[in-house]
Curated annotation (Swiss-Prot):
Region (Binds specifically PtdIns3P): 29-53
Cellular component GO terms held in the UniProt record: peroxisome
Subcellular location: Cytoplasm
Lineage, broadest ranks: Eukaryota, Viridiplantae, Streptophyta, Embryophyta, Tracheophyta
Gene name tied to this protein: PH1
Function text: Binds specifically to phosphatidylinositol 3-phosphate (PtdIns3P), but not to other phosphoinositides.
Record text on subunit structure and interactions: Binds PtdIns3P.
Signal peptide: none
Keyword entries, A-Z: Cytoplasm, Lipid-binding
Tissue: Ubiquitously expressed.
Protein name, UniProt field: Pleckstrin homology domain-containing protein 1
Amino acid sequence: MESIWRIATGQDPSREDYEGIEFWSNPERSGWLTKQGDYIKTWRRRWFVLKRGKLLWFKDQAAAGIRGSTPRGVISVGDCLTVKGAEDVVNKPFAFELSSGSYTMFFIADNEKEKEEWINSIGRSIVQHSRSVTDSEVLDYDHRR
């Protein structure tokens, strides 16, 4: 599981953060996003993969397609609380943020459609993998609709 310490210190993810996730095969969503650095607030374009409750990023698309490659970073979306637009926060078009109780990460998509698709995909993953919602509560919610 991704630790807040690892995010805060910028350390590479450990293998246990993404062990058992075949990120190179059939991701729920993948594509280019520009991510703001944690300490030096520069923007870097990275290839992102969303799969099984993990948001992983790589230097490029080729690295994400290789079995056994190491992601540049991993976020467990089940630990996150919100994903929403953030154009007004970072003053850039197509920006969105992913937040937990202790950190916020900012991303920029290539266009409005991509931004909305990432927000929707990550939002679904947060709900599916959140530790605050039990399986029975999800089933209960589905039956009440």
